[in-house]
Amino acid sequence: MSSPRAVVQLGKAQPAGEELATANQTAQQPSSPAMRRLTVDDFEIGRPLGKGKFGNVYLARLKESHFIVALKVLFKSQIEKEGLEHQLRREIEIQAHLQHPNILRLYNYFHDARRVYLILEYAPRGELYKELQKSEKLDEQRTATIIEELADALTYCHDKKVIHRDIKPENLLLGFRGEVKIADFGWSVHTPSLRRKTMCGTLDYLPPEMIEGRTYDEKVDLWCIGVLCYELLVGYPPFESASHSETYRRILKVDVRFPLSMPLGARDLISRLLRYQPLERLPLAQILKHPWVQAHSRRVLPPCAQMAS
């Protein structure tokens, strides 16, 4: 749904935003889609959180329960004009069935004559991309924590036969405690066979098999974790070049240039993920057990997830 480096932002953090997020801990969550049909009149609409090609995202509160959400409002005319009805239905179908502390919840959805409304979890600290822009690069502890959260969330997705295919800083939001929330499932796909052959995703993050049009599976997400880890630590993606053709060439040759400042443990992890052959990439379970991740991650599960486990 989003173009590279231009995505809808679900939360530009404001001081009031954290208070609203805290209030949600005691507020009643939105009822499931089967309970009753919602309309826009059920919400108090607040400030805009972001704008995109197909619509806008607003901070909103359910009048009945006072539960704080991000309300994504999409224009049907724009979606139909781009022929993205199927992609939107797929995004809703997939995200509505995913419940994990590091995946942005889609609580409910409804539509009227002109718009489609997605009721999403509010991520008060906004995009990881914005944090990276502000800091230029992240330290080992922050990066390792994000990688552990991401690997755990993707393990959950892959167990449900869901491939995300577009992991990148713009599609990772930050919760109240700074925990990662995978968002934007517009490119993701649910496939029982876990094997696809369509081109999608962001150029800097595309794995070799997708560039070459080969059949691929869930291991495309492993490649993306490697690219993300590099970008978080260095400040730019490993294959970033002056032209698309040069980026493609470097990806296909797996031409990774590690700066001298790259920690050896992180370099080892990235090297095990950025492999031309998908079967050679480090599995998610091994990412979670990797010595560098184990040594530096400070992942803290939210209370609800701790109780569930």
Curated annotation (Swiss-Prot):
SMART domains recorded: S_TKc
Where does the UniProt entry say this protein principally localizes?
A: nucleus
| Cellular localisation | Nucleus; Chromosome; Chromosome, Centromere; Cytoplasm, Cytoskeleton, Spindle
Which InterPro entries does this UniProt record tie to the protein? Aur-like, Kinase-like_dom_sf, Prot_kinase_dom, Protein_kinase_ATP_BS, Ser/Thr_kinase_AS
Residues that bear Phosphothreonine: 198
Q: Which organism is it from?
A: Homo sapiens (Human)
- Which major enzyme category is it? transferase
Question: Per the record, what is the consequence of mutating residue 52 to E?
Answer: In a lung adenocarcinoma sample; somatic mutation
Q: Name one GO biological process term.
A: protein phosphorylation
Under what name is this protein listed? Aurora kinase C
The record's comment on protein family reads: Belongs to the protein kinase superfamily. Ser/Thr protein kinase family. Aurora subfamily.
Positions annotated as active site in the UniProt record: 166
Its biological purpose: Serine/threonine-protein kinase component of the chromosomal passenger complex (CPC), a complex that acts as a key regulator of mitosis. The CPC complex has essential functions at the centromere in ensuring correct chromosome alignment and segregation and is required for chromatin-induced microtubule stabilization and spindle assembly. Also plays a role in meiosis and more particularly in spermatogenesis. Has redundant cellular functions with AURKB and can rescue an AURKB knockdown. Like AURKB, AURKC phosphorylates histone H3 at 'Ser-10' and 'Ser-28'.
Q: Where is the composition biased (Polar residues)?
A: 22-32
Q: Which UniProt keywords apply?
A: ATP-binding, Cell cycle, Cell division, Centromere, Chromosome, Cytoplasm, Cytoskeleton, Kinase, Meiosis, Mitosis, Nucleotide-binding, Nucleus, Phosphoprotein, Serine/threonine-protein kinase, Transferase
Q: How is its activity regulated?
A: Okadaic acid, an inhibitor of protein phosphatase 1 (PP1), protein phosphatase 2A (PP2A) and protein phosphatase 5 (PP5), increases AURKC activity. AURKC is also stabilized through its interaction with INCENP, which also acts as an activator.
Q: What Pfam families has UniProt attached to this entry?
A: Pkinase
The disease this record links to the protein is: Spermatogenic failure 5: An infertility disorder caused by spermatogenesis defects. Semen from affected men show close to 100% morphologically abnormal multiflagellar spermatozoa with low motility, oversized irregular heads, and abnormal midpiece and acrosome.
Expression by tissue: Isoform 1 and isoform 2 are expressed in testis. Elevated expression levels were seen only in a subset of cancer cell lines such as Hep-G2, Huh-7 and HeLa. Expression is maximum at M phase.
